[in-house]
UniProtKB/Swiss-Prot annotation:
GO cellular component, one term: cytosolic large ribosomal subunit
Family the UniProt entry places it in: Belongs to the universal ribosomal protein uL6 family.
Pfam families assigned: Ribosomal_L6
HAMAP family the record matches: Ribosomal_uL6_B (MF_01365_B)
Function: This protein binds to the 23S rRNA, and is important in its secondary structure. It is located near the subunit interface in the base of the L7/L12 stalk, and near the tRNA binding site of the peptidyltransferase center.
Keyword flag Ribonucleoprotein: yes
Keywords, ordered alphabetically: Ribonucleoprotein, Ribosomal protein, RNA-binding, rRNA-binding
Species the sequence originates in: Clostridium novyi (strain NT)
Protein's UniProt name: Large ribosomal subunit protein uL6
Matches recorded under Gene3D superfamilies: Ribosomal protein L6, alpha-beta domain
SUPFAM superfamilies: Ribosomal protein L6
Gene name, Swiss-Prot/TrEMBL: rplF
PROSITE patterns, per the entry: RIBOSOMAL_L6_1
Length: 179
């Protein structure tokens, strides 16, 4: 069995999990509700306070799907109970972030400010002008939105300027050496 897939997922108090015959998993919790369609080959069962994922065969594809399915369901359970957040840091002279309503405005050294519209299911917070916190209950969506913000100014290797994840180490290069 898959080392990840064989572990049961514990359902915390206040969380309700339903699985349809078409393998559509719905998880409701204190922070919200998530629904995701899983691969039809996987067998997903709710037993007492646990979710158990089993696979039909020892096929290589089924082994991979087994761990994936279990991880996706676990991410949904964690999302509706605790939520997810990614912190981005703006490094560079004049690089600033601010909220306008629910939308995010970034000054990144371009001739115009970058406007990032609010995405349903994701919330932006700006605790400092050089920090942006992207939070929500869907891990995939939070990561995707954070990556889309980072794309506007990826950190460059010479001075390290740009938008980076909190805790991300930028591989630095040495500049040209003079004579």
């Amino acid at each position: 069995m898959s080392r990840v897939g064989r572990l049961p997922i514990e359902i915390p108090n206040g969380v309700n999990v339903t699985v349809t015959p078409e393998n559509v998993v719905t998880v409701k919790g204190p922070k919200g509700e998530l629904t995701k369609a899983m691969h039809e080959d996987m067998n997903i069962a709710v037993e007492e306070n646990n979710i158990v994922v089993t696979r039909p065969s020892e096929n290589v594809q089924h082994k991979a799907l087994h761990g994936l399915t279990r991880a996706l369901i676990n991410n949904m359970v964690v999302g509706v109970t605790q939520g997810y957040e990614k912190t981005l840091e703006l490094v560079g002279v004049g690089y600033r972030a601010q909220l306008k309503g629910k939308d995010l405005t970034l000054n990144l050294g371009y001739s115009h400010p970058v406007e990032i519209k609010a995405v349903k299911g994701v919330e932006y917070k700006v605790p400092e002008p050089t920090k942006v916190v992207v939070s929500g209950i869907d891990k995939e969506l939070v990561g995707s939105v954070a990556a889309n913000i980072r794309v506007w100014r990826k950190p460059e290797p010479y001075k390290g300027k740009g938008i980076k994840y909190a805790g991300e180490v930028i591989r630095r290069k040495e500049g040209k050496t003079g004579k």
